[in-house]
Amino acid sequence: MKRAILIVLDSVGIGEMPDAHEYGDVGSNTIGNIAKARGGLHLPHLQRLGLGNIAPIQGVDPEASPQGCYGKMAERSPGKDTTTGHWEIAGVVLERAFPTFSKGFPEDFLQAFAERIGRQVIGNEVASGTEIIQRLGQEHVRTGKPIAYTSADSVFQIAAHEEVIPLEELYRICGIAREMLEGDLRVGRVIARPFLGEEGNFYRTTNRHDYAIEPPHKILLDMVKEKGLRVMAVGKIKDIYAGHGVTDHLASKGNRDGVEKTLAFIREKKPGLIMTNLVDFDMLYGHRNDVENYAQALEEFDGRLPEILASLEEEDILFITADHGCDPTTESTDHSREYVPLLVYGKKVVPGRNLGIRSSFADLGATIAEYLGTEELVNGRSFLGELI
């Protein structure tokens, strides 16, 4: 029974890419800089898999005989956002980046949007999600106008207090936005950002919902499903791929829950693909430049690895990677253009292989496709032959 278990550590980059200067990200190294700022990271289980063999990380030494295979991957697509990174893993390489809106969205779009949803909006600026709800949250509560904002990424985000605009209404509003944002406005994601609390103490809830655009062609998840295998998605994976190929889905409320849901799927012992996104690294710590809690989250995930490894069956292969960087030690609160780590482990995987620098995230998807016996991806070169 062949299974691939793919865990995406959202934003855990491992050093700037050669074109980082084009994105304002020179010097970014999410995991490396966290380790330096912290005086070292304690990640013994990731270390044993070979994490310290990929790049220098203070406190994470290279292993003479790693238990896993190791390398890093470059992003071929332009961009540094969640959708672009995950799509490339699944075989989609973009020719041009999704549009961004550093000065906010066009006024004519906002007026048409307001007419469709029956409410004016406030905001329409580049902002941190946690900051803007503190600044505009009370005005929203008083007027009922949702808060629209964006970031350096290709997103249109709508924040609303759950007691002012109920979740279902917020989701309806976001669905309308997704429908309207086409052509030059075709952002990678529309995101519902519900929050609760009172003035001076507003806080985001875990009821976010992402509205992605449809992938331009068949992706890894579609192919696994067409093979008659299960595609088990944990966290925001289903949203990122607009539901493509997903046969089973478990929402998760943070990293701990995401690991629990992943283990639940592993224990079901059904052949196919289990794909998990652990979002706390990015959402709670990277964007907030919270070095200490980012470090603690990495160490907490490392502490769960023995349980994950012990649950693997004879023909399981575990892949651990990321989708971009989000270095909390820099002045920027946005994603960073970085290589992502690649760790592979399985009972049939030859340990200690250096997989080098892969030229595309799609190499990972191509490897999973070959292992599960699906048709080939449009992009990517499989490295399965280096593993088994």
Curated annotation (Swiss-Prot):
Keyword tags: Cytoplasm, Isomerase, Manganese, Metal-binding
Molecular functions per Gene Ontology: magnesium ion binding; manganese ion binding; phosphopentomutase activity
A single Gene Ontology CC term: cytosol
Pfam families with a match to the protein in the record: Metalloenzyme
Catalytic activity, as annotated: 2-deoxy-alpha-D-ribose 1-phosphate = 2-deoxy-D-ribose 5-phosphate; alpha-D-ribose 1-phosphate = D-ribose 5-phosphate
Free-text comment on the cofactor: Binds 2 manganese ions.
Metabolic or biological pathway: Carbohydrate degradation; 2-deoxy-D-ribose 1-phosphate degradation; D-glyceraldehyde 3-phosphate and acetaldehyde from 2-deoxy-alpha-D-ribose 1-phosphate: step 1/2
Binding site for Mn(2+) 1: 10, 323-324
Cofactor: Mn(2+)
Parts of the chain that traverse the membrane: none
UniProt cross-references to Gene3D superfamilies, sorted A to Z: Alkaline Phosphatase, subunit A, Phosphopentomutase
Chief place of localization: cytoplasm
Sites where the protein binds Mn(2+) 2: 282, 287, 335
Presence of the UniProt keyword Manganese in the record: yes
Localisation: Cytoplasm
Any one Gene Ontology BP term: nucleotide metabolic process
E.C. number: 5.4.2.7
Role this protein plays: Isomerase that catalyzes the conversion of deoxy-ribose 1-phosphate (dRib-1-P) and ribose 1-phosphate (Rib-1-P) to deoxy-ribose 5-phosphate (dRib-5-P) and ribose 5-phosphate (Rib-5-P), respectively.
Family, as annotated: Belongs to the phosphopentomutase family.
PANTHER family, per database record: PHOSPHOPENTOMUTASE
Protein name as annotated: Phosphopentomutase
Organism lineage: Bacteria, Bacillati, Bacillota, Clostridia, Eubacteriales
Protein encoded by which gene: deoB
